[in-house]
Amino acid sequence: MAIKRKKISVIGAGFTGATTAFLLAKKELGDVVLVDIPQAENPTKGKALDMLESSPVLGFDANIIGTSNYEETADSDIVVITAGIARKPGMSRDDLVQTNQKVMKSVTKEVVKYSPNSIIIVLTNPVDAMTYTVYKESGFPKHRVIGQSGVLDTARFRTFVAQELNLSVKDITGFVLGGHGDDMVPLVRYSYAGGIPLEKLIPKERLEAIVERTRKGGGEIVNLLGNGSAYYAPAASLVEMVEAIVKDQRRVLPAIAYLEGEYGFEGIYLGVPTILGGNGLEQIIELELTDEEKAALEKSAESVRNVMKALI
C-alpha cells in the first residue's frame, strides 16, 4: 500500500488562513487545500500557486492548491476553520456571533460530508462559541473538535514576559486559561523563566500589567492595524496544534475543549491545559487552582456563556 502525506484543509483564505496554509506547507506537515467562497476562487488559487512557487527556494515538497470546491478537501486528516468576518475597531466579539455562526454551520456540513473522520480545529471568533457550534453541527466526538486560543494567548504572554526580563522566549513557559477575551486567565503561578517562578523575577505590579496587556493583546493589534486583526501569531499557533496532532507528539498545550465536569463546568467549550496527539485532544489536565484563580476562571466561563446566549 502506498504511503501518503497527511492532508490538511484550511477553510478561509484570508490573511490568517493563507498564512496558516503557507506555514503548514513550509513545515511539510501535509499537502494543503486552501478553500474560500466561489467569489474568491481565483485569488485563492493565486495565493496557493504563489506559495507553491516558493517551494524550490524554501525547500519543501508539500503540495498546495486553492479552490472553492469542497470535493477537493475529501478525506482530509485535519480541517482548520478560519473563515468568517474579521473583528473591526470598536467591534465586540459578541457582535460577531450570529454572522459567523451561519458560516460555521455551512462549513461544517461540507466537512462532515467530505471528511467524516477528520479532526477539526476552529479559530473563527468568538472562538469558544464557534467551536461549540461546530461540535454540535458536526456530531463529531468532542476530542475531534478543538478550538485555538490558548496557544496564541500564551504566546502573547510569553512574548511580553521575555521583553520584560530581556530573556529568550524559549525559556519562558506559561498557561493562559479560560475564554478568548478580556476575562482570560493567565496563570502566573504556573509560569516560569528557565524554571524560576515569574513571581520571583518580576515585581507584582509589572506582572499585573503584563497580564492585562495579554488580555487586551488582540485588541491592541486591531487598533494598530486599523483594519483587520492579527494573523501571523494566530496562524503560527494553529500550526503548532496541527503539528502536535499529525506527528502524535502528545504536547501539553492549552486548547479550547468541551468540558463535562472538568474544573466544575458542564457543557461548555473553554480554554484549559490539554494533551494534543494523534487522536486530537487526548486528555484534559486539571490543575489545582486557588480560590482566586477559580473565581477568575468562573468569570471567564460566564463571559463565554453570555456570548453563547446569542447563538441562534
Swiss-Prot record:
GO terms for molecular function: L-lactate dehydrogenase activity; L-malate dehydrogenase (NAD+) activity. It is an enzyme of class 1 (oxidoreductase). It catalyses: (S)-malate + NAD(+) = oxaloacetate + NADH + H(+). Its EC number is 1.1.1.37. NAD(+) binds at residues 12-17, 36, 100, 123-125. InterPro entries: L-lactate/malate_DH, Lactate/malate_DH_C, Lactate/malate_DH_N, Lactate_DH/Glyco_Ohase_4_C, Malate_DH_type3, NAD(P)-bd_dom_sf. Substrate binds at residues 87, 93, 125, 156. Keywords: NAD, Oxidoreductase, Phosphoprotein, Tricarboxylic acid cycle. The modification Phosphoserine is found at residue 149. It comes from Bacillus israeli. Belongs to the LDH/MDH superfamily. MDH type 3 family. NCBIfam families: MalateDH_bact, PRK06223.1. Transmembrane segments: none annotated. Homotetramer. GO terms for biological process: lactate metabolic process; tricarboxylic acid cycle. Gene3D superfamilies: Lactate dehydrogenase/glycoside hydrolase, family 4, C-terminal (3.90.110.10), NAD(P)-binding Rossmann-like Domain (3.40.50.720). Catalyzes the reversible oxidation of malate to oxaloacetate. The active site is at 180 (proton acceptor). It comes from the Bacteria. This is Malate dehydrogenase.
